[in-house]
Every structure is written in structure tokens, then in C-alpha cells.
Amino acid sequence: MSTSYTVLCHPRCSTCKKALAWLDEHNIEYTWRSIIEENPTTDELSQWTAESNLSIRRFFNTSGMTYRSAHVKDQLDDWEKNLSAEQVRAQAVELLATDGMLCKRPLLIDAQGHFVAVGFKESEWQAALL
């Protein structure tokens, strides 16, 4: 039984290139989706962040220029001091949906649209896919 995945990537991202090479090496079918041209929607991000059981911060590209120039860390810190966890997640999802460059990549989604992984750590992808 073969499953196809969607990989949300930036074309120049070296981590995305490593992830795609890993998928190719393991003959795993995928569709490439530009995280810039077709950034994740609020609905998608709400679903994926909930399914992941990860901190919302894991979904941010913390090394990106957009994250740093917009002072997103400070926004998240402020939200976490003043809002409930659910409100923080909702605010963060809204922010992530505004710009694909804010999102950590790659994002790996299964054929049914469910979250599989964020970022590329070979051991995590191996555990999830092989």
C-alpha cells in the first residue's frame, strides 16, 4: 500500500532539498507545493498544529529574516504572557497564514491532508514513513 504525501517547501531551502532527496531515495511519492506561492491557510494550519501535539513555536521558521524583522519571538512571548494556550495558538496560526516565509519547512502532509512532520530530521521522517 503506497501513500502519497504533499511537501510544502521553498525552492531554495537547503533543508527542503535534503528532505526531497530523502523521499526520492526511499521511493516515497510526493507532490511538491511552494510554501511561498501557495502558503498554508488558516484552516490547514489550525488542523496541522492541533494534530501535531507540538508547541506552536515549532511551526515558525525562527532563523528566517521575516521572523526576525517582524519581531515574532516578542509577539509570541507577549501572547504567552497574556493569553490562554488556545488563544496563543489561534493568533499564531493567523500570523503563520499571512506569509509562507514565517513557516518552518518542509511541512509534510499525508494524502488525507493530515500532519506528518515539520522540519526535516531524518530520524523523525524515518519513524513516521518507513
Tell me what each language-model feature is:
Residues 37-130:
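Thiol/selenol-based redox catalytic cores and closely related redox-interacting motifs
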Residues 2-26, 30-35:
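Local sequence-structure signature of Cys/Sec-based thiol-disulfide redox active-site neighborhoods
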Residues 1-3, 103-104:
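Residue-level preference for short coil/turn positions at secondary-structure junctions
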